């Protein structure tokens, strides 16, 4: 308890932590908790099982409680908040609605970005709902720019989504990431006129007074939304003229300057630099903290941690809510209506509730993105940006929005790019470092070579069902085609998985498959061996965990595996990410992961807490044709076996290349064993029992000491010499002075 209290954690949380037998904070907790309590944005990386959830949950719970306590006691905060409302009383570019490298002059009209690699944009302080309007932009240098109109929902990167319309210096018009030729190029000293006819739904532009014609027709889905003047720059400078000064090229045909627009046509920006809701106004559906997880299992796990940490917090009590798919929305809405302080959820259902206004983000103080690399790899970057844009950057009590990003791979390009966009000078806490395999993990590769192992020919039809990638191909023995070898690999992998279980008498293991259909097929094959979900204690008892299983089934399957009711958990990478399963003695990789970092994540699940573990990877020596769905339904009902480059949903998977990349990443050569999967015992005293703790006595410590002994002796001699010299120097000065 004292260890956590020394970091500033309140006694009520420290007491709950102590009851969980957390005597000391983990490294990631010791580094991150004080930083978050201090009000900073934090990027953290640590291994699964390192206490990462506690590292962000504990300070988030404490600050949410303190905020609610201040509100309860009527405290307004120590800082007087400067309002940005005065900015909205005139037409100018909005300092509260711009990119991080976008500068605005004191007049609010001269704009500049000197970032040469990235685009940075800005919107105006006011928008329009009706009428015919016009403004001018003058180019001050030869940098790149796009100017035009966008709604409040649009990205600041003008023209890259369906809510903005841009015209660029390269002579292209842009909308929804579609760049088409329009008008002509423009550069320094040119003046671009931006026309908006909301009544007709038309957008057009002019160059130095020359009408370039119709550029866009405004789609129906945004006709009732206000459109704001907008631009995006890359190493460029512009100056806007909304009509306060005389236009260089006055508009015709009834278009009027923005500054002359009637008040009933105008909508002010929502971005004012303040929280959108006053401190005293209570909104039951407006949480103080939002934690986003990539999977429902991880969300449930995090919510359980939050419940444990807040156990002794009272007056006011904290109210938490889990928002995930597969649960009746009306139940979640009922809890929201009664008030909620902390929300933990997955992107799909969160997006639904936010977009319909059921979940209000106007009072969010904390935004936590757990397993951010997983969220980005699943394609949720747009959702994250949209959500972040709706959260006020400064709360009504003068506190800044805190963003916490947790990722297994902080140094990935996507995570870096995200952090630069949504975080404010974040502190990096990277305790993971370079990927490496723990000493408690023995990992080996089993080559799956259909050319030397002809078992697949002899099995006939008594083999695992394959994924139907080759349903239309000739894969009979003797075809000698890539398709035949690929099908043979799929059959052999099923046999090798069974062989590995029998050879090592596995009593518990996680088995990773590449796709959901592979998981289903392996589960079915284990059922043919007499096992399956309902065969408790059987050698091949197993359950499946992947996105196509119903939520209650996934939860039930995970619990059954944890309790030991079944021996094997067959799952995909996405489903297993971050799940709190400790000390599993075995892992089988039926297929190597697409990303080399995931190899370390997989095998890192064995051998925890000083328990030895064995990870076996089945690696095909020939290329295997596998599913790679790019279709809109993400594989459901898809039978398009053509290659991706031919418009299909398959690719050739080269596991030998992937193995090479993994070995280069880990800077080691992974041992290979024969197809009989007999693993040589060469650890410690030659007696290794996987799943058991290392034998006491130091293992190979003696050999380590023998190697270091000469160096230690040399250091001891140097230490003795240094101390002797110091003692002599104590008398030497007096002797020197006597001489003179």
UniProtKB/Swiss-Prot annotation:
- Know the name of this protein? ATP-dependent RNA helicase DDX1
Which E.C. number(s) belong to this protein? 3.6.4.13
Cross-link entry Glycyl lysine isopeptide (Lys-Gly) (interchain with G-Cter in SUMO2), positions: 281
- Superkingdom, taxonomy of origin: Eukaryota
Q: What does this protein do?
A: Acts as an ATP-dependent RNA helicase, able to unwind both RNA-RNA and RNA-DNA duplexes. Possesses 5' single-stranded RNA overhang nuclease activity. Possesses ATPase activity on various RNA, but not DNA polynucleotides. May play a role in RNA clearance at DNA double-strand breaks (DSBs), thereby facilitating the template-guided repair of transcriptionally active regions of the genome. Together with RELA, acts as a coactivator to enhance NF-kappa-B-mediated transcriptional activation. Acts as a positive transcriptional regulator of cyclin CCND2 expression.
- Sites bearing Phosphoserine, chain numbering: 481
Q: What gene is this protein translated from?
A: Ddx1
PTM comment: the record says: Phosphorylated by ATM kinase; phosphorylation is increased in response to ionizing radiation (IR).
Q: Which PANTHER family match?
A: RNA HELICASE
Q: Which GO terms describe its biological process?
A: defense response to virus; double-strand break repair; innate immune response; mRNA processing; positive regulation of canonical NF-kappaB signal transduction; positive regulation of myeloid dendritic cell cytokine production; protein localization to cytoplasmic stress granule; response to exogenous dsRNA
Describe the location of the Helicase C-terminal domain by residue ranges: 493-681
Q: Which UniProt keywords apply?
A: Acetylation, Activator, Antiviral defense, ATP-binding, Cytoplasm, DNA-binding, Exonuclease, Helicase, Hydrolase, Immunity, Innate immunity, Isopeptide bond, Mitochondrion, mRNA processing, Nuclease, Nucleotide-binding, Nucleus, Phosphoprotein, RNA-binding, Transcription, Transcription regulation, tRNA processing, Ubl conjugation
Keyword Transcription among record annotations: yes
